[in-house]
Amino acid sequence: MSKIIGIDLGTTNSAVAVLEGTESKIIPNPEGNRTTPSVVAFKNGEIIVGDAAKRQAVTNPETIISIKSKMGTSEKVSANGKEYTPQEISAMILQNLKATAESYLGEKVEKAVITVPAYFNDAQRQATKDAGKIAGLEVERIVNEPTAAALAYGLDKTDKDEKILVFDLGGGTFDVSILELGDGVFDVLATAGNNKLGGDDFDQKIIDWMVAEFKKENGIDLGQDKMALQRLKDAAEKAKKDLSGVTTTQISLPFITAGAAGPLHLEMALTRAKFDELTHDLVEATRQPVRQALSDAGLSTSDIDEVLLVGGSTRIPAVVELVRHETNKEPNKSVNPDEVVAMGAAIQGGVITGDVKDVVLLDVTPLSLGIETMGGVFTKLIDRNTTIPTSKSQVFSTAADNQPAVDIHVLQGERPMAADNKTLGRFQLTDIPAAPRGIPQIEVTFDIDKNGIVSVKAKDLGTQKEQTIVIKSNSGLSDEEIDKMMKDAEANADADAKRKEEVDTRNEADALVFQTEKTLKDLEGKVEEAEVKKAEDAKEELKKALEGEDIDDIKAKSEALSEIAQNLAVKLYEQANAAQGEAGEATDAQEGPKDANTFDGDFEESK
């Protein structure tokens, strides 16, 4: 069975891992980095992903960041003269990670386990699955990020019984999960979180502070300047990282804008104390989900054996301090917060292929599921933190006499009224025979699969007529749309490969021209004029081809020059050998022959 890669599709950074033997390994990207920025840019019709896209973000307005925060919504982003869904942009990141894995493994990769925040709803999970499909990946499993982290942490500890709390604060989302580990079973007891809280929010607090301070000093609002804002974002992210290790950092942005008197520079010092003050409300927002998860799991802090920190934002000292305070535990530092999720996803891939034995993953649904009933009430069928996959049925009836149809309004959330929860979908069960209210028996069944994706069935027990839907949110893509996007993605991949081949061909041709010129200089006056002219002509032909766009012509001219250059190189080599031989003979001749009766010796002059 071919390898199933593990992918952590993050808000700010992503990572890809693979199981080698029994060990999960992070695959470095072509730049040698173990994580890849979740950044996509468009330039001259070319799609740029990762480190290269992030590097040019300041000067390129066609750069898209933090697309994960839009997953599961109908919001689109405009770039490159067209509109893209969040799934399409995410697919470009996934394609990049897929190519990295293929280059490392030396084989095609078609299957993946992709992680999502535990608190992702059905629409966001479905969007992630669609993104994988567009990227040409069969998504074998969607795994919650804290669960994947626990899997990576606990794989070599399957003989121990432990309860662990995973605190996962990433670039755009926050989750807390509590798991029980024992005998190879990873059982999620509870999960809580916030899909709108992460490192990006901490960056924004610094940006807002810099904008306000600069306006106070110079009367200019940098918030209105797109290019300045991108520089501020980069500086804020760097300052935040610096303050995890030092207590003060200098922010220096020369020529940030211009005033009436000329260019203006931004120079500010940010202390950790000020940063803590600016972000106090964000850190505090992580407290309640920790308590909620413990309460839902029916545990107290003394029951927790280990606390794992996951996500780059858990390096913030104030966050670490809050976790210490809430759990009365020193967080476990044995896992890399940026890499552990992808490693866990790769382990789950190994469980699916059978390479990892005796490991069972029991995940939960993060939010309650149910339907709207009379009076706009939300009636739950499946409570949050129910182990998945699961199925639950309940019988309802009509609200009016002779009601011919019932509307099934499917919801996800925790609020008592339907209007306050997230709508997953609506459908109708029709042709109900005329009967007084309360008589027809309508059975509603919820199914949640191992990926946390929901399907709902309504059945009239009297007529046995039923209607089923797999939930598709407003942002959900039809199969036709996904197929079209897959074809576009494949075309982009082919175009990228072709563009790379063209660049490589041009680079090789340039190098060949340079090498030929060097060889001709070395051979000056040592070979026949006709041979030199032949090489000169071929070289000029190639230089001329390089000025054009015909890659096949460049290849043909390169091959012709390469053959001539090789012959010249052979001649140069032969001449060098011949010269060496002559030099050796000349030395022997100078020393002259020695007579058999002649001896070498030292002598002194006697006085």
UniProtKB/Swiss-Prot annotation:
Sites bearing Phosphothreonine, chain numbering: T173
Conditions for induction: By stress conditions e.g. heat shock.
Segments of this protein annotated with the region Disordered: 578-607
Sorted UniProt keywords: ATP-binding, Chaperone, Nucleotide-binding, Phosphoprotein, Stress response
Superkingdom classification of source: Bacteria
Chaperone found in the keyword field: yes
GO molecular function: ATP binding; ATP-dependent protein folding chaperone; unfolded protein binding
HAMAP family from the UniProt entry: DnaK
PANTHER family reported for this sequence: HEAT SHOCK PROTEIN 70KDA
Family, per entry: Belongs to the heat shock protein 70 family.
Its biological purpose: Acts as a chaperone.
Name by which UniProt lists this protein: Chaperone protein DnaK
Organism: Lactococcus lactis subsp. cremoris (strain SK11)
Taxonomic path: Bacteria, Bacillati, Bacillota, Bacilli, Lactobacillales
